[in-house]
């Protein structure tokens, strides 16, 4: 009897309960904490999408924070550490602390930040490819999504290091649009789209998406293209993160050069003060003051011939005779000769 009742209830032709869930009129209950978090994420998504490259350092910090926190949270909460299952609050605290360290590294070391930005872009594009592939082909092995995600992430990370501005703009716009899409999915259908994407990564079967889920998913490429155009034409035009680095280096070099010049000037002044000596006044010569050595020699012979000594001659002379062995001697022509009595 009960079996017949069960068969009758099954054969009544009722619709699948999931079909009723796709109706927008179904009641949904929102928690306070996820609602506040999604509201804040909407603000971050807008900044990422339209001002990503302009706020370069902030974006590098947030990229490292989100990536590090997500990876550590999944490892701590999903896996057993030292034979103990960590609680949700403890896992979130550990993930936040390590995420802050990762954010500081990506902000201070630009190459690491750019590499992380390229990784995020590659992962997002790989996830989008898996969602599109599921509509035509279900991957039989888990290595297919893993290989696709790893290859795409490494490819776009290298491309971001090569063409930094272009792929930074593309990555920030795409990631910001993904954040806005996830927040919209929470407010409309309580993360059904996110659960569907997560099932694609685990290769598990899930219910097909509702019609408005595809509308929400279509917001992602539209917002991405809009963000790329706005950044390239408005917010990121005329701005380059490399100019900021070069200008700071130039300022440091200019300060070093100024200090080196000041030090050289001080050394030169000190050396000049130590070696400065007053020069002697040059000897004044007049026309006709130079006498031939032969004339002086004959004058001496005349003086010695009369018996006058050199000492008496020096006392009677009114002018001192200067001897110069290189250019001759110089004496004034007005010098008076001693009187010799015969």
Swiss-Prot record:
Keywords for the protein's UniProt record, in alphabetical order: Cell membrane, Cytoplasmic vesicle, Developmental protein, Membrane, Transmembrane, Transmembrane helix, Wnt signaling pathway
Transmembrane segments: 32-52, 55-75, 90-110, 112-132, 141-161, 174-194, 210-230
Effect of loss of the gene: Morphants have defects in neural crest formation. At the tadpole stage, animals are often less pigmented with ventrally bent tails. Embryos develop smaller eyes and forebrain structures.
Disulphide connectivity of cysteines: none
Membrane topology summary: Multi-pass membrane protein
A Pfam family hit: TM7S3_TM198
Cellular component terms (Gene Ontology): cytoplasmic vesicle; plasma membrane; vesicle membrane
The keyword Cytoplasm belongs to this UniProt entry's keyword annotation: no
Location(s), subcellular: Membrane; Cell membrane; Cytoplasmic vesicle
Chief localization: membrane
GO biological process, one term: Wnt signaling pathway
InterPro entries for the chain: TM7S3/TM198-like_dom, TMEM198
Function: Promotes lrp6 phosphorylation by casein kinases and thereby plays a role in Wnt signaling. May be a membrane scaffold protein involved in the self-aggregation of lrp6 further enhancing its activity. Required for neural crest formation.
Family the entry assigns: Belongs to the TMEM198 family.
Description of how the protein assembles with itself and partners: Interacts with lrp6. Interacts with casein kinases.
Protein's name in the database: Transmembrane protein 198
């Amino acid at each position: 009897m009960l079996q017949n009742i069960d068969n009758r209830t099954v054969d009544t032709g009722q619709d699948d309960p999931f079909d009723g869930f796709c109706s927008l009129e179904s009641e949904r209950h929102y928690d306070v904490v996820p609602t506040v978090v999604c509201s804040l994420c909407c603000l971050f998504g807008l900044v990422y999408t339209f001002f990503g490259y302009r706020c370069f350092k902030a974006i590098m910090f947030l990229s490292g924070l989100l990536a590090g926190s997500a990876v550590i949270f999944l490892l701590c909460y999903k896996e057993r550490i030292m034979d103990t299952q960590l609680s949700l609050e403890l896992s979130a605290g550990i993930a936040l602390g390590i995420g802050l360290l990762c954010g500081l590294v990506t902000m201070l070391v630009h190459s690491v930040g750019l590499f992380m930005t390229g990784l995020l872009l590659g992962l997002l594009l790989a996830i989008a490819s898996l969602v599109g592939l599921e509509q035509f082909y279900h991957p039989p092995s888990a290595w297919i999504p893993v290989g696709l995600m790893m290859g795409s992430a490494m490819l776009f990370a290298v491309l971001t290091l090569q063409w930094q501005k272009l792929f930074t703009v593309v990555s920030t716009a795409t990631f910001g649009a993904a954040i806005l899409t996830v927040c919209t999915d929470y407010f409309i259908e309580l993360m059904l789209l996110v659960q569907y994407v997560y099932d694609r990564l685990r290769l598990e079967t899930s219910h097909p998406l509702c019609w408005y889920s595809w509308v929400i998913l279509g917001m992602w490429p539209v917002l991405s293209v809009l963000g790329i155009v706005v950044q390239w034409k408005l917010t990121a035009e005329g701005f380059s993160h490399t100019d900021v680095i070069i200008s700071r280096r130039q300022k440091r070099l200019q300060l070093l050069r100024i200090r080196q010049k000041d030090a050289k000037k001080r050394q030169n002044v000190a050396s000049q003060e130590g070696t400065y000596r007053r020069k002697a006044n040059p000897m004044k010569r007049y026309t006709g003051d130079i006498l031939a050595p032969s004339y002086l020699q004959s004058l001496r012979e005349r003086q010695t011939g009369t018996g006058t000594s050199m000492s008496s001659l020096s006392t009677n002379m009114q002018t001192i005779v200067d001897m110069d062995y290189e250019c001759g001697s110089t004496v004034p022509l007005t010098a008076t000769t001693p009187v010799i009595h015969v």
